[in-house]
Amino acid sequence: MPDQLPATDSTFRHVPVLADVLLNALDEEPSVHWQSGLVVDATLGGGGHSSLLLDRYPDLRLIGLDQDPTARAAAATRLSPWKERVSIVATNFADYSPPQSASLVLADLGVSSPQLDVAARGFSFRLDGPLDMRMNPESDGETAGELIERMEESDLADLIYAYGEERLSRRIARRIKADLAAQGPYAGTASFAYAVAGCYPPKARRGRIHPATRTFQALRIAVNDELGVLDQLLSSAPGWLQPGGLLAIISFHSLEDRRVKTAFLQDERLDRITRRPLVASAEEQERNPRSRSAKLRIARKRSES
């Protein structure tokens, strides 16, 4: 494994989480099952995980999927040393089927650092930008701003509670709808985050986690149908694998992890490799705070499936 990843576009720098954890776990698996053949990186992003796999395992070929054009451009740069072994496809993994059986399917479900750190994408409550949150900014899908205007207060509260696990969801939804009625659409993510934070008691606004975190998560999940898309992946991906092939999924919050855990337990095509999720080391958590909530689960396709 190289000490440094290949250089990539300066607008899309992303440190892949659980990289060493993933590679170490894969190294423990019989090489006959997966260290040659096709890898499908269902969430290519900037190509961080893919570059490590391609460098470490020279017999792998890779198909990378991503609906974000900025991510695809960055990945093409980062993966250029292995371009003869790489194909990048502009698609959401829910709409995809590989041309042949894969030996490994990988999905990193987190929002990448560049998406969070570019104000214009509208994912961040720390940087002011349009209240957008679409993974594919070129799509004609509904933005977060449009969603909160369209929804009734009670439905918005239910959404924030269900997808953000936010205990103050009704108070937050009431404030959002009151603001929209009084002043029209929010100017951007900063004013929206300020309004959400104002629903918290003063002491609760000074914690390590920003008070708007759960509400932003809920809206992002809804705008991109993230849980529906994940359910589709969990249903489809075992069918993409050859017998003995591996399915590795990195999740970042309990709604995702519960779905992955349940699917790995209940899908008769799969055997769990990780009984408990693998997590970042203390060193990685210190180096990359976004790894603190990451959980990796791996399953193997049964030979008789």
From Swiss-Prot:
Residues 290-305 have a biased composition (Basic residues). It catalyses: cytidine(1402) in 16S rRNA + S-adenosyl-L-methionine = N(4)-methylcytidine(1402) in 16S rRNA + S-adenosyl-L-homocysteine + H(+). Its EC number is 2.1.1.199. Signal peptide: none annotated. One of its GO terms (cellular component) is cytoplasm. InterPro entries: RsmH, SAM-dep_MeTrfase_MraW_recog, SAM-dependent_MTases_sf. GO terms for molecular function: rRNA (cytosine-N4-)-methyltransferase activity. S-adenosyl-L-methionine binds at G47, G48, H49, D66, F93, D108, Q115. GO terms for biological process: rRNA base methylation. The keyword Cell cycle does not apply. It holds the Pfam family Methyltransf_5. Belongs to the methyltransferase superfamily. RsmH family. PANTHER family: 12S RRNA N4-METHYLCYTIDINE METHYLTRANSFERASE, S-ADENOSYL-METHYLTRANSFERASE MRAW. NCBIfam families: 16S rRNA (cytosine(1402)-N(4))-methyltransferase RsmH. Specifically methylates the N4 position of cytidine in position 1402 (C1402) of 16S rRNA. This is Ribosomal RNA small subunit methyltransferase H. The gene is rsmH.
